[in-house]
Design a protein with these regions (language model features):
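Extracellular/periplasmic catalytic domains that process cell-envelope and extracellular macromolecules
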Residues: 3, 35-37, 62-63
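Non-catalytic, surface beta->alpha helical segment in thiol-disulfide oxidoreductase systems
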Residues: 27-29, 64-103
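Hydrophobic beta-strand anchors of alpha/beta hydrolase catalytic cores
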Residues: 9-10, 42, 69
């Protein structure tokens, strides 16, 4: 991963994932969450097909499936202690993003 001008957020999602849809419709658009998300370089990985390539990506990060959020520092190192797996509330994600941004 090339250097970025800020932290990177990799959002792994799937069209069949109900929790992904909840987060996309109700969590990410919340004003404070959206404000904090704007400070990240956002990458989205669509694992809808659940094919060999998708499985390899999930395996690479040790994830069981979407929704999953993986954070990276500006220099491309994963900040693995801040991973999010599964559906989270806007309040929880807002606090989580603030912690990552404070690093």
């Amino acid at each position: 991963m090339a250097s970025s001008s800020g932290p990177v957020l990799l959002d792994l999602y799937a069209d069949w994932c109900i929790s992904c849809k909840v987060m996309e419709r109700f969590v990410f658009p919340e004003p404070e969450v959206a404000r904090q998300l704007a400070r990240f370089t956002l990458l989205r990985a669509d694992v809808t097909a659940n094919d060999a390539q998708d499985q390899a990506l999930l395996k690479q990060f040790g994830l069981f499936g979407p929704p999953s959020l993986v954070f990276f520092s500006e220099d491309g190192r994963e900040i693995d202690e801040f991973r999010v797996q599964g559906e989270v509330s806007a309040d929880r994600l807002e606090a989580h993003l603030a912690q990552v941004l404070a690093l």
